[in-house]
Regions:
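Non-catalytic accessory segments flanking enzymatic or RNA/DNA-binding domains
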Residues: 1-139
Length: 139
């Protein structure tokens, strides 16, 4: 097995999450993504460092009790992105296409199928608002 196949095999066998990250307060957009469970906070840090809006994890869907949890997580992520394609903020396949405009239907689906981060022992945010950020996202 070559290195690429070894990495793919390790990735697929890792416990994972489909995650929903909300941008803004109140939430204006939702990112639907997938990551290994051990990398969830690193993903949030990565996204927050390149986003001027406060980000927080709205919910996660854990995948861990199958032979290849990440493969199942990726399949679920694709299903959700397809289901909410009409809310996609950027053209499919381009940078940013994992971001969706918030809607009552999307938030209801997240509440229905997701688990709150606190229930998994995950912090929902890594930022502390500064003096230049009010509740409407600006001054």
């Amino acid at each position: 097995m070559n290195n690429k196949n070894l990495y793919q095999d390790e990735w697929e066998k890792s416990p994972g999450y489909v995650y929903f990250i909300g941008a803004g307060d109140p939430v204006k957009a939702v990112k639907i993504g997938v990551t290994r469970q051990k990398g969830m906070m690193q993903r949030l840090r990565h996204h927050q460092s390149s986003n001027h809006e406060p980000l927080r994890i709205l919910a996660v869907i854990p995948f861990e009790s199958t032979e290849r949890p990440m493969r199942k997580a990726e399949k679920k992520e694709k299903e959700l992105r397809t289901k909410f394609a009409h809310l996609q903020r950027f053209e499919n396949g381009w940078v940013g296409s994992e971001w969706f405009t918030v809607s009552d239907v999307l938030l209801a689906e997240i509440d229905k199928i997701g688990i709150k981060p606190k229930e998994r022992g995950i912090r929902d945010s890594i930022m502390i608002p500064g003096p230049g950020l009010d509740r409407q996202g600006g001054r």
